[in-house]
């Protein structure tokens, strides 16, 4: 089977374990999910045949996760809220506190991520507002089958997804891609591990919405 002409977002949804592979090679399957594998590989100077081989191996391995492509939309919305929205609400306040501590204690050390707490708090505020709008406005419309009324709200949500992606780029830069310096304390290392987990969760969250929930709600798939 060839994968090169299929968009990254489609591959991320149809082969759930592909998201880990895409993160490994820094391929944006969320907001950049419309890019084909071939174009993404060329943009990042990656071996296309190697990528296709790895995807084929993943695709041939049975997956225990639910296939959300055929699930009722109300169940998909509920899953996103419980699996991702609640998780982000738990993750970000703790990460902000840890970042504040690291910046205060290690402010003079090489590699100290000065400004990280501010960026994480900005992300927290943006996501809090974003998720509330989804839960109070967009998801109820989707659950009621009001796809024709979803174009405007979905356009806003996709724009906010891109804004969140830009904040993640800043966070990656400040943390040297979540790489703690040699001799970093436990809190510092735990902070970067927590940020890595947050980014992985957020990318899966956005991919599920951009590449599956929103197109299905609009009747595009």
From Swiss-Prot:
Any GO BP annotation: response to nitrosative stress
Subcellular location: Cytoplasm
Pfam families, per database record: Hemerythrin, ScdA_N
Keyword Ligase: no
GO cellular component entries: cytoplasm
Key words, A-Z: Cytoplasm, Iron, Metal-binding, Stress response
Recorded GO MF terms: metal ion binding
Domain of life: Bacteria
UniProt xrefs under CDD domains: Hr-like
Described function: Di-iron-containing protein involved in the repair of iron-sulfur clusters damaged by oxidative and nitrosative stress conditions.
HAMAP family given in the database record: RIC_YtfE
Family: Belongs to the RIC family. YtfE subfamily.
Self-association state and partner proteins as the record states: Homodimer.
Designated name of the protein: Iron-sulfur cluster repair protein YtfE
Organism: Edwardsiella ictaluri (strain 93-146)
Lineage per the UniProt record: Bacteria, Pseudomonadati, Pseudomonadota, Gammaproteobacteria, Enterobacterales
Gene behind the chain: ytfE
């Amino acid at each position: 089977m060839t994968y090169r002409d299929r968009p990254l977002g489609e591959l991320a949804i149809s082969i759930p374990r592909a998201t880990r592979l895409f993160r490994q090679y820094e391929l944006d399957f969320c907001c950049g999910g419309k890019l084909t594998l071939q174009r993404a590989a060329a943009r990042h100077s990656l071996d296309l045949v190697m990528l296709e081989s790895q995807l084929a191996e993943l695709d041939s391995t049975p997956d225990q996760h639910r296939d959300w492509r055929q699930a009722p939309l109300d169940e998909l919305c509920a899953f996103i809220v419980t699996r991702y929205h609640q998780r982000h609400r738990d993750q970000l306040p703790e990460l902000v506190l840890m970042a504040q501590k690291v910046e205060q204690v290690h402010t003079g050390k090489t590699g100290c991520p000065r400004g990280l707490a501010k960026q994480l708090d900005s992300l927290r505020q943006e996501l809090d507002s974003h998720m509330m709008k989804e839960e109070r406005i967009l998801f109820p419309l989707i659950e009621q089958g009001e796809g024709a009324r979803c174009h405007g709200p979905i356009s806003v949500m996709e724009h906010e997804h891109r804004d969140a992606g830009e904040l993640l780029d800043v966070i990656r830069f400040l943390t040297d891609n979540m790489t703690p310096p040699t001799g970093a304390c436990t809190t510092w290392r735990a902070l970067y591990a927590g940020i890595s987990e947050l980014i992985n969760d957020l990318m899966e969250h956005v991919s599920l919405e951009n590449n599956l929930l929103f197109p299905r709600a609009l009747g595009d798939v």
